[in-house]
């Protein structure tokens, strides 16, 4: 109930590793998050400290992460922050992991094309038939006349 939910913006630092487990699909990748600040003396942006997170995705999100992300991609990750400490070979190690709820490309830094998984990709439902894009343009001279437009009704009569 009292979980730490974070939204992190950074770059994919390692190739996503995808695995099919008994409990379902799983994927992980490292995310590099570098703070930036304005240097007033030099009038330019500077890179600050870089934090690295291991991002974990499960089930359908894992499948889509494995198929969509590459090293260097700018992404936005939302998920549960998990700080883990363990002893390895006599040394204490601390890692900051994110159990992802959502992962997407950062569209402030580039473009992306969304594609729904098809039924053959393992999704339960079949995607609806493609519909043509509606034409939002209005032909010149095709504006309806004022008398054919509905007139507003009074809000109330006193």
UniProtKB/Swiss-Prot annotation:
Short name of any one Pfam family annotated for the protein: SSB
Segments traversing the membrane: none
Positions of the SSB domain: 1-107
Recorded GO MF terms: single-stranded DNA binding
Keyword Ribosomal protein recorded: no
Annotated stretches, region: Disordered: 109-158
Listed InterPro entries: NA-bd_OB-fold, Primosome_PriB/ssb, ssDNA-bd
Entry's Gene Ontology BP terms: DNA replication
Keywords, in A-Z order: DNA-binding
Presence of the UniProt keyword Metal-binding in the record: no
Oligomeric form and interacting partners: Homotetramer.
HAMAP family the record matches: SSB (MF_00984)
Stated name of the protein: Single-stranded DNA-binding protein 2
Protein's organism: Streptomyces avermitilis (strain ATCC 31267 / DSM 46492 / JCM 5070 / NBRC 14893 / NCIMB 12804 / NRRL 8165 / MA-4680)
Gene (UniProt): ssb2
């Amino acid at each position: 109930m009292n979980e730490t939910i974070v939204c992190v913006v950074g770059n994919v630092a390692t190739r996503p590793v995808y695995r099919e487990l008994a409990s379902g699909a799983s994927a992980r990748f490292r995310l590099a998050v570098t703070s930036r600040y304005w240097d007033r003396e030099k009038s330019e942006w500077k890179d600050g400290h870089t934090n690295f997170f291991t991002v974990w995705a499960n089930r359908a999100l894992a499948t889509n992460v494995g198929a969509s992300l590459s090293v260097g991609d700018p992404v936005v990750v939302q998920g549960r922050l998990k700080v883990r400490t363990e002893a390895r070979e006599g040394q204490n190690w601390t890692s900051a992991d994110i159990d992802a709820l959502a992962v997407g490309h950062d569209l402030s830094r580039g473009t992306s094309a969304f594609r729904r998984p098809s039924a053959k990709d393992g999704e339960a439902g079949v995607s609806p038939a493609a519909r043509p894009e509606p034409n939002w343009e209005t032909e010149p001279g095709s504006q309806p006349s004022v008398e054919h437009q509905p007139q507003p009704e009074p809000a109330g009569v006193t």
